[in-house]
Amino acid sequence: MKIIDVTLRDGGHAVEFDWPLKFARQYYSTLSSINQIDYLELGYWGQKSKSANTFYDLDLEKVCSVTQKSNRSNVSIMIDYHYCSHEVSDYPTDSQSEISMIRMCSRKEDINEALEFGKELKRYTNINVSFNIFNASNYSEEELIETAKKVAPYPFDYIYFADTHGDLNLVHDLSRFKGAMGVFKSGGKKVGFHLHDHSGLAMVNYNELVKNNLDSTDTSIRGMGKGSGNLKLEYVLDKKYLGELSQLILNNEKLLTITPSPYDLITSKYGLTDNYAKRGKELAMSIADFENVCKRITSLDKDSYNKEILK
Protein backbone atom coordinates (compact mmCIF):
# COMPACT_ATOMS: atom_id res chain seq x y z
CA MET A 1 0.00 0.00 0.00
CA LYS A 2 1.31 3.42 -0.97
CA ILE A 3 1.55 6.27 1.50
CA ILE A 4 0.72 9.96 1.35
CA ASP A 5 2.44 11.56 4.33
CA VAL A 6 0.57 14.56 5.72
CA THR A 7 2.84 15.56 8.61
CA LEU A 8 3.23 19.16 7.46
CA ARG A 9 -0.35 19.61 6.30
CA ASP A 10 -2.47 17.91 8.98
CA GLY A 11 0.22 18.31 11.61
CA GLY A 12 0.10 21.99 10.82
CA HIS A 13 -2.97 22.22 13.06
CA ALA A 14 -0.69 21.49 16.03
CA VAL A 15 1.83 24.25 15.22
CA GLU A 16 -0.51 26.86 13.74
CA PHE A 17 0.85 25.98 10.28
CA ASP A 18 4.13 27.65 11.18
CA TRP A 19 6.73 24.92 10.70
CA PRO A 20 10.37 26.10 10.90
CA LEU A 21 11.81 26.11 7.39
CA LYS A 22 14.91 24.21 8.53
CA PHE A 23 12.74 21.35 9.82
CA ALA A 24 10.48 21.37 6.75
CA ARG A 25 13.54 20.96 4.51
CA GLN A 26 14.92 18.13 6.67
CA TYR A 27 11.53 16.44 6.61
CA TYR A 28 11.21 16.75 2.85
CA SER A 29 14.73 15.51 2.16
CA THR A 30 14.47 12.54 4.53
CA LEU A 31 11.04 11.31 3.46
CA SER A 32 11.71 11.84 -0.25
CA SER A 33 14.28 9.05 -0.02
CA ILE A 34 11.65 6.53 1.14
CA ASN A 35 10.20 4.64 -1.83
CA GLN A 36 7.16 3.52 0.14
CA ILE A 37 5.94 7.13 0.24
CA ASP A 38 4.32 8.37 -2.96
CA TYR A 39 3.55 11.94 -1.93
CA LEU A 40 4.48 14.45 0.73
CA GLU A 41 1.59 16.79 1.46
CA LEU A 42 3.17 20.09 2.46
CA GLY A 43 0.07 22.08 3.43
CA TYR A 44 -2.95 23.96 2.17
CA TRP A 45 -2.72 26.01 -1.01
CA GLY A 46 -3.60 29.69 -0.95
CA GLN A 47 -6.07 29.56 1.94
CA LYS A 48 -6.31 32.32 4.51
CA SER A 49 -9.51 31.79 6.49
CA LYS A 50 -7.96 29.92 9.43
CA SER A 51 -4.33 31.04 9.44
CA ALA A 52 -2.00 33.58 7.87
CA ASN A 53 1.01 31.29 8.29
CA THR A 54 3.05 29.68 5.52
CA PHE A 55 1.77 26.11 5.47
CA TYR A 56 -1.88 27.15 5.30
CA ASP A 57 -1.24 29.63 2.49
CA LEU A 58 1.24 27.88 0.19
CA ASP A 59 2.24 29.11 -3.24
CA LEU A 60 4.85 27.78 -5.64
CA GLU A 61 7.62 29.96 -4.26
CA LYS A 62 6.98 28.68 -0.72
CA VAL A 63 6.87 25.07 -1.94
CA CYS A 64 10.18 25.51 -3.77
CA SER A 65 11.67 26.99 -0.62
CA VAL A 66 10.97 23.67 1.12
CA THR A 67 11.89 21.35 -1.76
CA GLN A 68 14.83 23.54 -2.84
CA LYS A 69 13.70 22.93 -6.43
CA SER A 70 14.45 19.22 -6.28
CA ASN A 71 12.22 18.46 -9.32
CA ARG A 72 11.04 15.23 -7.68
CA SER A 73 7.35 15.83 -8.52
CA ASN A 74 6.31 14.26 -5.22
CA VAL A 75 4.53 17.17 -3.53
CA SER A 76 0.82 17.09 -2.80
CA ILE A 77 -1.18 20.13 -1.72
CA MET A 78 -4.60 20.21 -0.09
CA ILE A 79 -7.55 22.50 -0.69
CA ASP A 80 -10.85 22.57 1.16
CA TYR A 81 -13.61 23.42 -1.31
CA HIS A 82 -15.50 25.31 1.38
CA TYR A 83 -12.62 27.77 1.87
CA CYS A 84 -10.38 27.65 -1.21
CA SER A 85 -10.24 29.88 -4.28
CA HIS A 86 -12.64 28.75 -6.99
CA GLU A 87 -10.54 30.30 -9.78
CA VAL A 88 -8.60 27.49 -11.47
CA SER A 89 -5.96 29.96 -12.63
CA ASP A 90 -4.85 30.28 -8.98
CA TYR A 91 -3.49 26.71 -9.01
CA PRO A 92 -0.22 25.12 -10.20
CA THR A 93 -0.14 23.30 -13.53
CA ASP A 94 2.13 20.67 -15.05
CA SER A 95 4.47 23.44 -16.20
CA GLN A 96 6.35 23.00 -12.89
CA SER A 97 7.98 19.83 -11.50
CA GLU A 98 7.49 20.02 -7.74
CA ILE A 99 3.74 19.55 -7.24
CA SER A 100 2.12 16.55 -8.88
CA MET A 101 -1.17 16.25 -6.99
CA ILE A 102 -3.90 18.51 -5.67
CA ARG A 103 -6.23 16.96 -3.11
CA MET A 104 -9.60 18.58 -2.66
CA CYS A 105 -11.81 17.72 0.29
CA SER A 106 -15.52 18.34 0.31
CA ARG A 107 -18.31 18.39 2.84
CA LYS A 108 -21.53 16.57 2.02
CA GLU A 109 -23.40 19.81 1.37
CA ASP A 110 -20.74 21.06 -1.08
CA ILE A 111 -20.25 17.94 -3.19
CA ASN A 112 -22.15 18.94 -6.33
CA GLU A 113 -20.32 22.25 -6.69
CA ALA A 114 -16.99 20.69 -5.67
CA LEU A 115 -17.26 18.03 -8.37
CA GLU A 116 -17.73 20.60 -11.12
CA PHE A 117 -14.85 22.66 -9.81
CA GLY A 118 -12.67 19.55 -9.57
CA LYS A 119 -13.36 18.71 -13.20
CA GLU A 120 -12.23 22.17 -14.28
CA LEU A 121 -9.22 21.98 -11.96
CA LYS A 122 -8.10 18.71 -13.56
CA ARG A 123 -8.55 20.12 -17.06
CA TYR A 124 -6.63 23.31 -16.28
CA THR A 125 -3.75 21.88 -14.23
CA ASN A 126 -3.23 18.53 -15.98
CA ILE A 127 -1.81 17.05 -12.77
CA ASN A 128 -3.28 14.39 -10.48
CA VAL A 129 -6.38 15.43 -8.59
CA SER A 130 -7.83 13.57 -5.61
CA PHE A 131 -11.38 13.95 -4.33
CA ASN A 132 -11.57 13.46 -0.56
CA ILE A 133 -14.95 12.71 0.99
CA PHE A 134 -14.96 14.36 4.42
CA ASN A 135 -16.77 13.02 7.49
CA ALA A 136 -17.21 9.62 5.88
CA SER A 137 -18.33 7.89 9.07
CA ASN A 138 -21.57 9.89 9.05
CA TYR A 139 -22.63 8.52 5.64
CA SER A 140 -24.98 5.55 5.51
CA GLU A 141 -24.16 2.69 3.14
CA GLU A 142 -26.84 3.94 0.76
CA GLU A 143 -25.46 7.49 0.86
CA LEU A 144 -21.95 6.19 0.16
CA ILE A 145 -23.10 4.26 -2.91
CA GLU A 146 -25.18 7.20 -4.14
CA THR A 147 -22.20 9.52 -3.66
CA ALA A 148 -19.86 7.08 -5.41
CA LYS A 149 -22.13 6.92 -8.45
CA LYS A 150 -22.18 10.72 -8.53
CA VAL A 151 -18.39 11.09 -8.14
CA ALA A 152 -17.16 8.20 -10.30
CA PRO A 153 -17.73 9.81 -13.75
CA TYR A 154 -15.48 12.75 -12.87
CA PRO A 155 -11.80 12.66 -13.90
CA PHE A 156 -10.22 12.19 -10.46
CA ASP A 157 -7.16 10.01 -10.03
CA TYR A 158 -7.69 9.18 -6.36
CA ILE A 159 -10.78 8.94 -4.19
CA TYR A 160 -10.27 9.19 -0.45
CA PHE A 161 -12.61 8.56 2.45
CA ALA A 162 -11.68 10.67 5.49
CA ASP A 163 -12.36 9.27 8.96
CA THR A 164 -12.55 12.89 10.03
CA HIS A 165 -13.92 12.21 13.51
CA GLY A 166 -11.76 9.15 14.23
CA ASP A 167 -14.78 6.99 15.03
CA LEU A 168 -14.55 4.30 12.35
CA ASN A 169 -13.81 0.70 13.31
CA LEU A 170 -13.15 -0.85 9.92
CA VAL A 171 -13.25 -4.39 11.34
CA HIS A 172 -17.00 -3.80 11.47
CA ASP A 173 -17.51 -0.72 9.31
CA LEU A 174 -15.56 -1.49 6.13
CA SER A 175 -18.47 -3.51 4.74
CA ARG A 176 -20.45 -0.26 4.64
CA PHE A 177 -17.89 1.17 2.19
CA LYS A 178 -17.45 -1.85 -0.09
CA GLY A 179 -20.28 -0.99 -2.46
CA ALA A 180 -18.92 2.52 -2.98
CA MET A 181 -15.35 1.23 -3.32
CA GLY A 182 -16.54 -1.20 -5.98
CA VAL A 183 -18.06 1.65 -7.98
CA PHE A 184 -14.77 3.56 -7.86
CA LYS A 185 -12.61 0.53 -8.63
CA SER A 186 -14.70 -0.37 -11.67
CA GLY A 187 -14.02 3.14 -12.95
CA GLY A 188 -10.26 2.75 -12.54
CA LYS A 189 -9.92 5.04 -9.52
CA LYS A 190 -7.33 4.53 -6.80
CA VAL A 191 -9.03 4.37 -3.41
CA GLY A 192 -7.62 5.30 -0.02
CA PHE A 193 -8.49 6.28 3.54
CA HIS A 194 -7.35 9.09 5.83
CA LEU A 195 -7.36 7.55 9.31
CA HIS A 196 -7.61 9.61 12.48
CA ASP A 197 -6.71 8.05 15.82
CA HIS A 198 -9.17 9.72 18.18
CA SER A 199 -10.44 6.34 19.41
CA GLY A 200 -7.11 4.51 19.15
CA LEU A 201 -8.12 2.44 16.13
CA ALA A 202 -5.93 3.88 13.37
CA MET A 203 -3.56 0.89 13.30
CA VAL A 204 -6.43 -1.60 13.48
CA ASN A 205 -8.09 0.20 10.59
CA TYR A 206 -4.86 0.26 8.58
CA ASN A 207 -4.57 -3.52 8.89
CA GLU A 208 -8.10 -3.86 7.50
CA LEU A 209 -7.14 -1.68 4.52
CA VAL A 210 -4.13 -3.92 3.84
CA LYS A 211 -6.28 -7.06 4.03
CA ASN A 212 -8.72 -5.56 1.54
CA ASN A 213 -6.10 -4.34 -0.96
CA LEU A 214 -6.74 -0.62 -0.72
CA ASP A 215 -4.38 1.48 -2.81
CA SER A 216 -3.28 4.20 -0.43
CA THR A 217 -3.45 5.63 3.06
CA ASP A 218 -2.35 8.81 4.81
CA THR A 219 0.18 8.90 7.63
CA SER A 220 2.00 11.47 9.72
CA ILE A 221 5.11 11.31 11.84
CA ARG A 222 4.15 10.45 15.43
CA GLY A 223 0.54 10.95 14.35
CA MET A 224 0.95 14.73 14.05
CA GLY A 225 -2.45 16.15 13.21
CA LYS A 226 -5.69 17.71 14.32
CA GLY A 227 -7.21 16.50 17.57
CA SER A 228 -5.66 13.20 18.66
CA GLY A 229 -3.85 12.84 15.37
CA ASN A 230 -3.48 10.30 12.58
CA LEU A 231 -2.09 6.92 11.65
CA LYS A 232 1.59 7.00 12.65
CA LEU A 233 4.06 6.75 9.78
CA GLU A 234 6.66 4.97 11.90
CA TYR A 235 4.22 2.13 12.67
CA VAL A 236 3.54 1.23 9.03
CA LEU A 237 6.89 2.00 7.42
CA ASP A 238 9.18 -0.79 6.23
CA LYS A 239 11.73 -1.35 8.98
CA LYS A 240 14.65 -0.63 6.67
CA TYR A 241 13.66 3.05 6.71
CA LEU A 242 13.29 3.44 10.47
CA GLY A 243 16.85 4.57 11.19
CA GLU A 244 16.70 7.82 9.24
CA LEU A 245 13.14 8.54 10.34
CA SER A 246 13.98 7.91 13.99
CA GLN A 247 16.90 10.34 13.78
CA LEU A 248 14.62 13.00 12.29
CA ILE A 249 12.20 12.46 15.17
CA LEU A 250 14.97 12.57 17.77
CA ASN A 251 16.32 15.82 16.35
CA ASN A 252 12.85 17.41 16.47
CA GLU A 253 11.14 15.57 19.31
CA LYS A 254 9.58 18.60 20.97
CA LEU A 255 8.22 19.92 17.67
CA LEU A 256 6.82 16.51 16.72
CA THR A 257 4.61 16.05 19.77
CA ILE A 258 0.86 16.32 20.22
CA THR A 259 -1.14 15.76 23.40
CA PRO A 260 -4.37 13.81 22.85
CA SER A 261 -7.33 15.23 24.73
CA PRO A 262 -9.94 13.18 26.63
CA TYR A 263 -12.54 15.42 25.02
CA ASP A 264 -11.55 13.87 21.66
CA LEU A 265 -12.71 10.49 22.98
CA ILE A 266 -16.18 11.92 23.51
CA THR A 267 -16.46 13.65 20.12
CA SER A 268 -15.25 10.43 18.50
CA LYS A 269 -17.86 8.43 20.42
CA TYR A 270 -20.62 10.56 18.91
CA GLY A 271 -19.06 11.08 15.46
CA LEU A 272 -18.51 14.83 15.90
CA THR A 273 -15.92 17.27 14.63
CA ASP A 274 -13.13 17.59 17.17
CA ASN A 275 -13.61 21.36 17.16
CA TYR A 276 -16.19 20.69 19.87
CA ALA A 277 -13.48 18.92 21.87
CA LYS A 278 -11.19 21.90 21.49
CA ARG A 279 -13.91 24.23 22.75
CA GLY A 280 -14.86 21.94 25.63
CA LYS A 281 -11.25 21.95 26.75
CA GLU A 282 -11.07 25.75 26.52
CA LEU A 283 -14.15 25.99 28.74
CA ALA A 284 -12.73 23.39 31.18
CA MET A 285 -16.04 21.53 31.08
CA SER A 286 -16.53 18.38 33.09
CA ILE A 287 -16.67 15.31 30.87
CA ALA A 288 -20.23 14.61 32.06
CA ASP A 289 -21.41 18.09 31.05
CA PHE A 290 -19.52 17.92 27.77
CA GLU A 291 -21.00 14.54 26.89
CA ASN A 292 -24.51 15.73 27.70
CA VAL A 293 -24.06 18.43 25.05
CA CYS A 294 -22.41 16.13 22.51
CA LYS A 295 -25.12 13.48 22.59
CA ARG A 296 -27.69 16.08 21.47
CA ILE A 297 -25.76 17.36 18.44
CA THR A 298 -27.35 16.19 15.19
CA SER A 299 -27.39 16.60 11.42
CA LEU A 300 -24.81 18.86 9.74
CA ASP A 301 -23.78 20.27 13.12
CA LYS A 302 -22.01 16.96 13.72
CA ASP A 303 -19.64 17.59 10.82
CA SER A 304 -19.49 21.39 10.73
CA TYR A 305 -18.71 23.13 14.01
CA ASN A 306 -21.58 25.26 15.31
CA LYS A 307 -20.09 27.84 17.67
CA GLU A 308 -23.54 28.55 19.15
CA ILE A 309 -23.65 25.11 20.79
CA LEU A 310 -20.75 25.69 23.21
CA LYS A 311 -20.43 29.33 24.21
Give the location of each predicted region.
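Catalytic cores and adjacent flexible loops of soluble metabolic enzymes
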Residues: M1-K311
